[in-house]
């Protein structure tokens, strides 16, 4: 019966982040769709999808920080990956969206 307890713990842990993961996946799919469809046609919707993606990453990161230390030496691999994804997403969205807005 120990494996059932392990699965329940895993399910409970996943449920904490479920809403954030749904927003993250939905906005990532919207970003990919808008990139393939053409950003120039829908720049404001694309920026909205990027903003949702980044805000859900931030929410996921801060939910993760409640259980993990903030100091750099004590940060886990998953925390470092979340930080890297957030930074890459922010830089990519700025570089992608900049040419489409009038100066």
From Swiss-Prot:
GO MF annotation terms: oxidoreductase activity
Membrane topology, record value: Multi-pass membrane protein
Enzyme class: oxidoreductase
Primary site of residence: membrane
CC annotations in GO: plasma membrane
EC number, as in UniProt: 1.9.3.-
Subcellular location: Cell membrane
Swiss-Prot/TrEMBL keywords: Cell membrane, Electron transport, Membrane, Oxidoreductase, Respiratory chain, Transmembrane, Transmembrane helix, Transport
Source taxon at top rank: Archaea
InterPro entries assigned to the protein according to its UniProt record, in alphabetical order: Cyt_c_oxidase_su4_prok
Transmembrane segments: 20-40, 42-62, 75-95
Protein's UniProt name: Heme-copper oxidase subunit 4
Gene: aoxC
């Amino acid at each position: 019966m120990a494996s059932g307890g392990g699965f329940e713990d895993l399910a409970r842990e996943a449920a904490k982040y479920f809403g954030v993961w749904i927003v993250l996946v939905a906005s990532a799919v919207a970003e990919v769709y808008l990139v393939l469809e053409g950003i120039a046609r829908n720049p404001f919707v694309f920026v909205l999808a990027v903003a949702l993606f980044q805000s859900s990453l931030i929410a996921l990161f801060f939910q993760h920080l409640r259980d993990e230390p903030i100091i750099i030496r004590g940060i886990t691999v998953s925390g470092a990956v979340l930080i890297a994804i957030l930074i890459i997403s922010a830089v990519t969205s700025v570089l992608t969206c900049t040419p489409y807005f009038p100066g």
